[in-house]
Amino acid sequence: KESSDIVIMDNNLISIANAVLYGRTIFKSIRKFIIYQLTVNCCALVLSFVGPFIGIPTPITVIQMLWINMIMDTLAGLAFSYEAPLKEYLKEKPKKRNQSIINKFMYTEILITGVYSSFVSIFYLCSPYIKSFFRVDRDNIYFMTGFFALFIFMGIFNAFNARTTRINLLSNISKNKVFIILFMCISIVQMYLIYFGGSLFRTYGLSFKELMIVLAMAFTVIPVDIFRKLLFKRRGVI
């Protein structure tokens, strides 16, 4: 036993296949979480750097960032950890011991989605056209509430991008009910914060039109990533 690489405790060779399957599932879940976290962090970093140059020193307040970090560090990690072990994982080639955990597919998703999310955020903040959809007030409270909602909902939609390499973002999603429940809860809490967060979260209730503008802009991260996946699929990478 001491010199063995694998010890079968139940004298059943199927246990080896199960161990490999669950090991690969955990490995993939870690990768999904890394994609999600680095994408959101990339966007947040760009905003923190660019914000002061466009006249908005704090696009995201400290309290809002605490809520964002709770989603990224705790709830998202929990959601991805419940990804189901799929039999198709056993058909993949073995991973090398020295293989990097971040591959080319992940780099492109982090870079493209992160940069695109940053572009959407900056466009929102700088565009007079977008601002014209929001009620006018001295402190831009409705406009900045919309930006907070935009940032969160882009993260929620991007979670669906990160959880699968397939074009169909809902592929096998029914096997991870925790993912569905957690992101539904995050969406509900976010809606509550928009309308009842008040001065603590710097949020004030959006009108239906304002909310639809925010959701439509946030949703665009999905077709952008689907297009990226189509390019990879055409090249035979996925």
Question: What residue ranges belong to the model's regions?
Answer:
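Multi-pass alpha-helical transmembrane bundle typical of ion/small-solute transporters
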Residues: 181, 211-214, 238
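Small-residue-rich transmembrane alpha-helices that serve as helix-helix interface/gating elements
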Residues: 148, 207-221
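Membrane-interface capping segments at transmembrane-helix boundaries
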Residues: 227-238
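Hydrophobic alpha-helical segments of multi-pass membrane transport proteins
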Residues: 147-166, 182-190, 221-228
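Membrane-embedded transport module
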Residues: 1-166
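Transmembrane helix-loop junctions at the membrane interface of multipass transporters and ion channels
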Residues: 49-58, 191-207
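Hydrophobic alpha-helical transmembrane segments in multi-pass integral membrane proteins
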Residues: 120-124, 185-199
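Cytoplasmic-side transmembrane-helix entry/capping segments in multi-pass membrane proteins
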Residues: 171-179
